[in-house]
Amino acid sequence: MDIFPAPAKLNLFLHVIGRREDGYHLLQTVFRFIDHSDRLHFDITHDGVIRHENLIPGLTETDDLCVRAAKLLRQRFGRESLGVKIHLEKNIPLGGGLGGGSSDAATTLIALNRLWGINWKRERLMALGLELGADVPVFIYGRNAFAEGVGEELHAVDLPSAWYVVLTPPVQISTAAVFTSKELTRNTIPIKMAAFSMGQGHNDLEPVAMRMQPVIAGWLGWLKQQHGTTKVAMSGSGSCMFAEFPSESAAREVFGRLPGDMSGFVVSGLARHPLSDF
């Protein structure tokens, strides 16, 4: 395999149920992978150099999650001669709450684990991923999941097939700014997966994000006015949002009514991560 996909995710709900002494928030969420991916290519070298060939403008290699993931894996494996040239085709919106950076890091760990001949088990890679970010482990886990803790306690869930209209407002939201906001609800009562299956659940981050970027409220309001959707919510800390539909035709009908000043895409939900068996 020359090209490795890094799929986006949706948070079908996201509750903040507490806060640890170290400042990390305790969450409940359902992660769903969708068929919209970044694509990564890895050119293996043996000169000890790890380089991202096409860094996102404004991002340094010190901050780049792909480079950080590669360096962390090599450091723990203990072979400094391992090198790689990374090329990223970026399709997932930045700062949108779709997990693009975390997914890129996870795909880097999954791919280099094989390409470098390390062959560690997924559980070990998930522990490395958690050092890079709370959302990284689920992409290595490879299954849609009910998540608890800071997002690392994962329980596989089988979700019904669904299609989504995902809207992409022209704004970015800082995850850190949302989670440090004094207005964030941090004491939502925990629920069971069965309650989510019966339609319970919301996104506690939505009100904060809407105050930071009022355009989010307007776009969410438009989605909620459309007929045929089974769920409308912001994903993660935003700014992207989604409406869920039981069929592609229903999703495309609503997307066809999208006002000219709004943008997005139609996509299907995935049953598994495309690299779950790699």
Swiss-Prot record:
Top-rank EC class of the record's enzyme: transferase
Pathway(s) it belongs to: Isoprenoid biosynthesis; isopentenyl diphosphate biosynthesis via DXP pathway; isopentenyl diphosphate from 1-deoxy-D-xylulose 5-phosphate: step 3/6
Active site positions, chain numbering: K9, D135
GO BP, one annotated term: isopentenyl diphosphate biosynthetic process, methylerythritol 4-phosphate pathway
Catalytic activity: 4-CDP-2-C-methyl-D-erythritol + ATP = 4-CDP-2-C-methyl-D-erythritol 2-phosphate + ADP + H(+)
GO terms, molecular function: 4-(cytidine 5'-diphospho)-2-C-methyl-D-erythritol kinase activity; ATP binding
Entry's EC annotation: 2.7.1.148
Keywords annotated in UniProt: ATP-binding, Isoprene biosynthesis, Kinase, Nucleotide-binding, Transferase
Keyword S-adenosyl-L-methionine among record annotations: no
Binding site for ATP: P93, L94, G95, G96, G97, L98, G99, G100, G101, S102, S103
Coiled coil: none
NCBIfam families with a match to the protein in the record: ispE, PRK14608.1
Family membership noted in the UniProt record: Belongs to the GHMP kinase family. IspE subfamily.
PANTHER family: 4-DIPHOSPHOCYTIDYL-2-C-METHYL-D-ERYTHRITOL KINASE, CHLOROPLASTIC
Purpose: Catalyzes the phosphorylation of the position 2 hydroxy group of 4-diphosphocytidyl-2C-methyl-D-erythritol.
Name by which UniProt lists this protein: 4-diphosphocytidyl-2-C-methyl-D-erythritol kinase
